[in-house]
Amino acid sequence: VRPADRHNRGMETPALLDTLLRTPGPSGYERDAARVWREAAGFAEITTDGLGGSIATIGDDEGAPLVAVVGHIDEIGLVVTHIDEKGFLYFEPIGGWDPQILVGQRVTVTGNEGSVPGVAGRKPIHLLDPEQRKKVVKLKEMHIDIGADDREASQALVSVGDPVVIDAEPMAVASGRLVSRSMDNRLGSYVALEALRRCHEDSKMKARFAAVAAVQEEIGLFGSRTAAFTVRPDLAVAIDVTHATDAPGVDEKEVGSHPFGSGPVIGRGSTLSPKVYELLRDTAEAAGISYSVGASGNATHTDADSLQISRTGIPTGLVSIPLRYMHSPVEMVDLADVEATVELIRAFVNGLEPGVDLSR
């Protein structure tokens, strides 16, 4: 673990989570982050699917229920689409961006032979006319400057199609909170694997457990769909993030009440299995784990949506971690909520019995 600062309420950032957060891995370019995840899963049986998803499985009783706990490992990013004659890079988004966030950010391009630093720039405010200053910047008005003199110099370092992420390393702040890019959703992939590790050490399981680091969630929930066909689970739980409601501007009437320190958010709604919800809720209450309930009348816009309609239908639950400033380089989480989520999944899996009723 990495020591937290003196304001950090004794919480420490787990070493695996820290490494995952630092490793670039936008949707479709998750290879390096997935490699970190698989290396940490050496105690389990490891497989991959054709899309790049990673699966770590424990338990060998073929008659026991198989639960898949899925956290997508991809993050939002950018992809280089053009290099002009002056060596500047132009790009398209990978996933959903607020363009204003990108202005003036340091970035890292995964280039021909490694990481290439640069900055995201636009016309300086001094040169904008009054009408331009009133408008939200568009991505097509921005560029990336890696310091190269011309196209040839840039092409020696990067190529069209190379991925880009904002250069923002994890930072511990007060009250046991952690700030980083890629919390959405390295947190989910971390929780799935850490719960798997603890269940492996407990040796209490009566079920089989597959932790999944799914890919390409941010561009269409694709990786969880292929992983479901590979794993063929009897039930599944998606782990993702949701909006923490104790930040300014977040309306609890719209998203419910999920402040920092309230623990995991257990999903309930139209597309989620009532039985899996009840099992998660009962597990939290029996274990004394604080939680809140997040309701959805439509799609959840998480991997739970693709999991529950895979194959002939998979009873699926959703557990989310409250997060501030989603889809930004300063996503913030309370580490106590992360730990509580790991413990919920650990207790949930350890409590699954053969013959569990999952009927709807």
Show which residues each predicted segment covers:
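N-terminal hydrophobic/helix-forming segments and targeting peptides
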Residues: V1-R360
